[in-house]
Amino acid sequence: MLSRLMSGSSRSLEREYSCTVRLLDDSEYTCTIQRDAKGQYLFDLLCHHLNLLEKDYFGIRFVDPDKQRHWLEFTKSVVKQLRSQPPFTMCFRVKFYPADPAALKEEITRYLVFLQIKRDLYHGRLLCKTSDAALLAAYILQAEIGDYDSGKHPEGYSSKFQFFPKHSEKLERKIAEIHKTELSGQTPATSELNFLRKAQTLETYGVDPHPCKDVSGNAAFLAFTPFGFVVLQGNKRVHFIKWNEVTKLKFEGKTFYLYVSQKEEKKIILTYFAPTPEACKHLWKCGIENQAFYKLEKSSQVRTVSSSNLFFKGSRFRYSGRVAKEVMESSAKIKREPPEIHRAGMVPSRSCPSITHGPRLSSVPRTRRRAVHISIMEGLESLRDSAHSTPVRSTSHGDTFLPHVRSSRTDSNERVAVIADEAYSPADSVLPTPVAEHSLELMLLSRQINGATCSIEEEKESEASTPTATEVEALGGELRALCQGHSGPEEEQVNKFVLSVLRLLLVTMGLLFVLLLLLIILTESDLDIAFFRDIRQTPEFEQFHYQYFCPLRRWFACKIRSVVSLLIDT
């Protein structure tokens, strides 16, 4: 009896798993879930802990054992999705950026979105020009330390905060000047609201970049925003497709297709190549979810989307949440006392270390910095050409690297939007989707060359540490060998064409074989049809019937009788 109770209790313990979720303010929430707990259960626990009602904009992100990032699906089991050993570690992040963050109903929601965009600014996902960068950083400063006080804030106090991947003394002085003269008297809530209003006007607001390559092999970043699909190359936005113009999203292997229908019945297919099939599928699922959330009027219009082709079954996916319009209508009905907000304040965060000095660019003369940058970019040409590398954007101190975009689109009337100027270029963007094998090392190597430091969050999410100087030199020596071993998109397209031809040939042969068997069965049957009577009277059929079909039939009958008799005897 005692052993039975002990075994039952041990089984119940094995069915419970510890989960740690890192929040946007870098604190952690730990809970225990059952083995069969769905993602919705964990998400509801988290939102209850945060006292969050407008929760549809947020999601939980995790990294699988292959270093591929995913959004937790709320309709599926948490344990089955993670595929890793407990305890589980995940991150709470903004999944769908509100089209107008200032219009959010509750201050707690605005504060969480503010933390996400501040993180985007630091990691290089939110690109902007110098004047906009200084204003955004000043808003953050006002929200975190309050009004300027000469007794508390000595000269150069703004340099103690890391707002961007890179910064200069000139930018620091501009931030401090705005903070001193323009923002005095603003409360944290007001500064955060002004920050959101400014960020929402930027071209890269809501961008969660996926590293890819175009058909020419040039590095590109694909992203989905509240307003449509964007493609970024260098420091420019080269494509912007509104959601009502996107007719279909599809992927096959590492190839991602975007079908576009514009005015005057112009149909376009944009083609890009992801580093791995898993990264391409993640990109496709993100596109399906974003299109459903921002484009549809109600969730009942959501349909299951398939990536299948003519002969083979592909992936199927369905967005399971509410759409943006429904979320706004639900938010308008919220009537409660505003919850208390515990702001992080001056506590050093893992994503924005308050005391850590980032790379400052004024210690080297401008002309020399430009020459150094050009030599670095020349050394990284092979890295950019590798399908397994992390695409590297050019920094702001040299000529802007903007490769020619080639796709199925022959004529484009789009204007190329410059999203960052020479004084500010976050070249060390933390990519949301890990690339293939060796990609993490290559990304860290490029960051070492550009002089940027990895945040603690990046190290934890990637589960890898920054390489030492010796490791960096060793990796640098292996770059050319790695790059020479990887084929480009053109060779990949040829391989895909050959595979498709082989598939078509196999399917055709299979169909012919089935038709031949069906014809033999019908002609050997007693079916009295003129067509089959004519076939039976031909010399060829009589020869086939007596020399091949009849002996084969007798052989099968003999085998069947022997098997039956064996079964009866046993």
From Swiss-Prot:
Keyword Phosphoprotein applies: yes
Transmembrane segments: 504-524
GO-annotated cellular components: adherens junction; cytoskeleton; membrane
Pfam families linked: FA, FERM_C, FERM_M, FERM_N
Main location as per UniProt: membrane
Compartment(s) of residence: Membrane; Cell junction, Adherens junction
Region (Interaction with ROCK1), start-end ranges: 308-353
SUPFAM superfamilies linked: PH domain-like, Second domain of FERM, Ubiquitin-like
Residue stretches making up the FERM domain: 17-298
InterPro entries linked: Band_41_domain, Ez/rad/moesin-like, FA, FERM/acyl-CoA-bd_prot_sf, FERM_2, FERM_central, FERM_CS, FERM_domain
Residues in coiled coil: none
Result for mutant: Y546C: In NEDEMA; uncertain significance
SMART domains given in the database record: B41, FA, FERM_C
Disordered: region residues: 344-367, 385-407
GO process terms (BP): actomyosin structure organization; negative regulation of cell motility; positive regulation of cell adhesion; regulation of cell migration
PROSITE patterns the record matches: FERM_1, FERM_3
Subunit and partners: Interacts with CTNND1. Interacts with ITGB5 (via cytoplasmic domain) and ROCK1.
Function: May be involved in regulation of cell migration. May regulate cell-matrix interactions via its interaction with ITGB5 and modifying ITGB5 cytoplasmic tail interactions such as with FERMT2 and TLN1. May regulate ROCK1 kinase activity possibly involved in regulation of actin stress fiber formation.
Disorder named in the UniProt entry: Neurodevelopmental disorder with eye movement abnormalities and ataxia: An autosomal dominant disorder apparent from infancy and characterized by global developmental delay, intellectual disability, speech difficulties, ataxia, seizures, and abnormalities of eye movement.
The name this protein goes by in its record: FERM domain-containing protein 5
Organism name: Homo sapiens (Human)
